Regions:
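Conserved catalytic motifs of ABC-family nucleotide-binding domains
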Residues: 81
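Helical segment within the ABC ATPase nucleotide-binding domain
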Residues: 100-112
């Protein structure tokens, strides 16, 4: 999972933070002594290179910018070899330019790795620009489920203001929602 607030250990290096994504797969002794399997170190360097932070491998996390910290979080999540990557407000703590870079990175990684990415995000413009599908919910109910270019003002009104407009989900639950 990619967290809104990064959730890095500031006193650890980038590599150590990245390897924390593998803690559930290595022995306690290996974790305590920081003796990570060679294949995990190789994979970490490949991913860090891909997201542009390999040169920070030995840098403490508290020395990084917000965008660099979020990239560490992305690599840590990918080290878990997930079937789906969850991202909770991955751009909330970032400036607009860095937000675009992180959203572009998530989109590109999703396509390259053929990995679904589920992003919880409140920035509608970012959602429209960087995703292939938007699901809008209100009070736990799907109000909209379609391609970004189908998100029009009436759908936005239904999602955010709770207007009585019809459900616009277009998804498999339409019949259940309509009945």
């Amino acid at each position: 999972m990619v967290f809104q607030g990064f959730n890095l250990v500031d006193r650890l290096t980038v590599m150590e933070n990245v390897q924390s994504g593998r803690l559930g797969y290595i022995s306690t002794w290996s974790a305590i002594t920081r003796r990570y399997p060679k294949q995990d170190i190789r994979r970490a360097y490949e991913l860090m290179e891909r997201v542009g932070i390999a040169h920070y491998a030995d840098t403490r996390a508290d020395q990084l910018s917000g965008g660099e910290r979020q990239r560490v979080g992305v690599v840590r999540a990918l080290m878990q070899e997930p079937d789906i990557l969850l991202a909770d407000e991955p751009t909330a703590s970032l400036d607009p330019k860095t937000s675009e870079q992180i959203m572009g990175l998530l989109r590109d990684l999703s396509r390259e790795l053929k990995l679904p990415v589920l992003i919880n995000i409140h920035n509608v413009n970012e959602a429209k620009e960087y995703t292939d599908r938007i699901v809008g919910m209100r009070y736990g109910r799907i109000i909209f489920d379609d391609k970004p270019d189908m998100l029009d003002p009436s759908a936005m009104e239904a999602i955010y203001a709770g207007s009585p407009h019809a459900d616009r989900s277009g998804g498999p639950d339409d019949k259940a929602a309509a009945s």
